[in-house]
Amino acid sequence: MLGDGLSVALAGLLHDVGKLYSRARWGERDDQVPDRTHTAYTAHFVREHAGLFRGAGLDPDWLARTASRHHEGWRDRPQYRPETPEEWCVALADTYASKEREEGEGGGSPPEVPLSPPFRRLLLGGEEGREGGYSPVGAGGRVGLEAGGLYPEERPNVSKDVYKRLLERLEGRLEEMARFSLGKEALVLNLALALQETLSLVPSDTQSEPDVSLYDHLRLTAAIAHALWLFHGGSPSAQNLRQDGEKFLLVVGDMGGIQGHIYRIAGAEAGVGGIAKRLRARSLEVSLAAEAMALGLLWRLGLTSLNRILGAGGKFYLLLPNTEEARAALEGTREAWGRWALKRGGSLVPHLAWVAFRGQDFRDFAALLKRLHEALAREKLRPFAFLASTGGVLGAPLRPCAACGLEPARRDEPGSLCPDCEREAALGARLPRSDRVGFFLEEAPRPYLDFPGLKVGLGGPLEGAFHLFRARLDFAPWPDPSEAKPLLGHLPRVEHALKAKGWSLEAYRAWAEEEGLLEDEEPHPEKVLTFAELAALSEGAPYLGALMLDADRMGEAFATGFRREGRDLATPSRLAALSRTLEVFFTTEVLTLLEEPRRYRERLGWDDLEAQRKEARYPLLYSVYSGGDDLFLLGPWDALLDFALDLERLYRLFTRHPRLTLSGGFLLVPPSLPVPELARLLGEAEKRAKAEGRERLFLFGQAVPWETLRGLRAWAEGLRQDLRAERVSRAQVYRWLLLWRRFSPLEDPGERMRYKPLLAYALRRVRERDEEAWKRYLKLLDHQDPAWAYLPVWVQWALYRERRV
């Protein structure tokens, strides 16, 4: 059998799967596989499932040989040395993808060596991450990767028995696949999903630094093998394959103007185009635009999504063959997407850049990325370079869209929207009922996003799509090519309000009518809550909470975090693992904390009452955007502030790195505040938090370290109870605020201390009401105590919790 590119990619994807078998059966006699090498087990794996591979048009014997014969240096086992061009292609891809193995060291029994987190070796501010490893099998019956599984432990659960459980899961997934009639690409991507589930938490190599998962290594090997095979036109000689040259293209795609595009919505009221639906749809459009550009390129060249080696947050990196066809596809894509952007007002600007490189350049991937980013910077200096002249003519004046203000409205009447904003509202309404995203080459179910060469629809099952995104980390086989990409986020609906308040639908309708919140759309459980409803569901003052968080030092982490004296450890596998793991946090972990907070009860130390409260309140939060390394959430302000504290704690547990922290801004705003203004204020708040040292949340006018904020939460709750019991009056509290604002900003230390006698005098009123309360608030006389330093934060927190306006 002469291999095609997809078959060679499959061999690359499976080449080290035998390591799972060898570790599960470590030290045991195995009559089926006498030499017990991982290469022998790889061949055994393929032959055990020969029917599955044969059903997809593959020769199992060819696949077994091509996948297992990838060790050129095994001179004492010639049966595993490459001979055919296909075998050499996989062997070379394995070598290029394994540069971290050259670091040496390591040891220990392979089944007992845990996978270290990708953050472990990041050197930031002179510090590396803490020791720890992943448990591939966890509490509650977890086997492999799922929400809550990527938290390092000091004593991870890893052993032969754990590998046996993983092997059972993998075998079970293949049995499920056998029930479908799978094409070759669907088989490749279903296998990739099964390997992602079972091999994401085990190391590729246990004899060197074990910080690259076996899944990440297999995926990258498949991508390199596919690109290398296509470079040679599908019929190379072994000699031509082994001769190095600029056979690869590394491509970066970047959507510019993301925040401006998402937040450029003129109408902020729910009645103007249904902003609660449209804002999430517009954010999703940005993510899907980048994905559509990447998938369109890969499809044109006959590659799979495995060749998207990095990507998140409107940016992607592709590994392509350096062929005339690939370069022509890149040029055509750049122009087609540029014209698409111009037609839509130019608020979202796609950029595409690439560099050619040799196989040996995988050795210094950091230098390769630097070249690529320089090319991208040059590309950004000349957007829409394909335009020779405008060539446009003025048309009849049209009313601008009432929502975006960029495109002409469909009708010349007040409040009329452009077709794109109308579609966003329809997509937003469809989001709660969708469990997948489909990419179509021709017609797609309406409403859909219309990108150059592709249409993208939401819902299920989306027949006719050539590629699907799953909305959850779901690894069960599907009949069509797909991957797990949780991009749809969370929209709070009426059903969540009913659960949080213990209401019936009739009670909810009566409440909405009394609050003046009823719209034209009749209430039903699937209806998306408006911003006004979310504000009214706050406990305390009816304001909308807004939270923007960003991962600190991530740019530094990717650029120089793996750099050491004389060498750079930033291999493509390490960077892919870092990107993928970070994406899991900002998509899956954030989403799961929103929708299923009880999962984190033990990890975050909640009691029953606290877990019950969070389970009712957190689903009311609205994810405008969460992915890459940042997020933007809205919702009832009290629930959102609690959520921010829990999420920051989870992030620390997730990274176990003292320099990997979160910074951001939190605001209370009226629900009618225009979205562009809200985004601007949040951006300024986030900048203030970072400017004052990072690892802070800016709220109520101050940037507060997270651990300090947890202590202030107790002060806020204590004051709230004192206000309710009338142990402290509001006048007393406003007096404290007045003294703080008068004296704290003073530059002279002595002058700042003048607040103390005035505060002591004011506190006499508290003593008259309650002696114990008075003793607690005497701490405010210590000017170094956080309770005084950040008094406006906890005082306003308590006042807003006790106020309805």
Curated annotation (Swiss-Prot):
<feature type="domain" description="GGDEF">
    <location>
        <begin position="542"/>
        <end position="702"/>
    </location>
</feature>
<dbReference type="GO" id="GO:0003723">
    <property type="term" value="F:RNA binding"/>
</dbReference>
<comment type="function">
    <text>This subunit is a single-strand-specific deoxyribonuclease (ssDNase) which digests both linear and circular ssDNA; it has both exo- and endonuclease activity.</text>
</comment>
<keyword id="KW-0067">ATP-binding</keyword>
<dbReference type="InterPro" id="IPR052117">
    <property type="entry name" value="Cas10/Csm1_subtype-III-A"/>
</dbReference>
<dbReference type="GO" id="GO:0016740">
    <property type="term" value="F:transferase activity"/>
</dbReference>
<dbReference type="InterPro" id="IPR006674">
    <property type="entry name" value="HD_domain"/>
</dbReference>
<comment type="subunit">
    <text>Probably part of the Csm effector complex, that includes Cas10, Csm2, Csm3, Csm4, Csm5 and mature crRNA.</text>
</comment>
<comment type="function">
    <text>CRISPR (clustered regularly interspaced short palindromic repeat) is an adaptive immune system that provides protection against mobile genetic elements (viruses, transposable elements and conjugative plasmids). CRISPR clusters contain spacers, sequences complementary to antecedent mobile elements, and target invading nucleic acids. CRISPR clusters are transcribed and processed into CRISPR RNA (crRNA).</text>
</comment>
<dbReference type="GO" id="GO:0004527">
    <property type="term" value="F:exonuclease activity"/>
</dbReference>
<keyword id="KW-0378">Hydrolase</keyword>
<comment type="similarity">
    <text>Belongs to the CRISPR-associated Cas10/Csm1 family.</text>
</comment>
<dbReference type="Pfam" id="PF18211">
    <property type="entry name" value="Csm1_B"/>
</dbReference>
<dbReference type="InterPro" id="IPR043128">
    <property type="entry name" value="Rev_trsase/Diguanyl_cyclase"/>
</dbReference>
<keyword id="KW-0547">Nucleotide-binding</keyword>
<keyword id="KW-0614">Plasmid</keyword>
<dbReference type="InterPro" id="IPR013408">
    <property type="entry name" value="Cas10/Csm1"/>
</dbReference>
<dbReference type="GO" id="GO:0051607">
    <property type="term" value="P:defense response to virus"/>
</dbReference>
<dbReference type="InterPro" id="IPR000160">
    <property type="entry name" value="GGDEF_dom"/>
</dbReference>
<dbReference type="GO" id="GO:0005524">
    <property type="term" value="F:ATP binding"/>
</dbReference>
<keyword id="KW-0255">Endonuclease</keyword>
<dbReference type="Pfam" id="PF22335">
    <property type="entry name" value="Cas10-Cmr2_palm2"/>
</dbReference>
<dbReference type="InterPro" id="IPR041062">
    <property type="entry name" value="Csm1_B"/>
</dbReference>
<keyword id="KW-0051">Antiviral defense</keyword>
<protein>
    <recommendedName>
        <fullName>CRISPR system single-strand-specific deoxyribonuclease Cas10/Csm1 (subtype III-A)</fullName>
        <ecNumber>3.1.-.-</ecNumber>
        <ecNumber>2.7.7.-</ecNumber>
    </recommendedName>
</protein>
<dbReference type="Pfam" id="PF01966">
    <property type="entry name" value="HD"/>
</dbReference>
<keyword id="KW-0694">RNA-binding</keyword>
<feature type="region of interest" description="Disordered">
    <location>
        <begin position="99"/>
        <end position="119"/>
    </location>
</feature>
<dbReference type="InterPro" id="IPR054767">
    <property type="entry name" value="Cas10-Cmr2_palm2"/>
</dbReference>
<feature type="region of interest" description="HD domain">
    <location>
        <begin position="1"/>
        <end position="99"/>
    </location>
</feature>
<keyword id="KW-0269">Exonuclease</keyword>
<dbReference type="GO" id="GO:0004519">
    <property type="term" value="F:endonuclease activity"/>
</dbReference>
<keyword id="KW-0808">Transferase</keyword>
<keyword id="KW-0540">Nuclease</keyword>
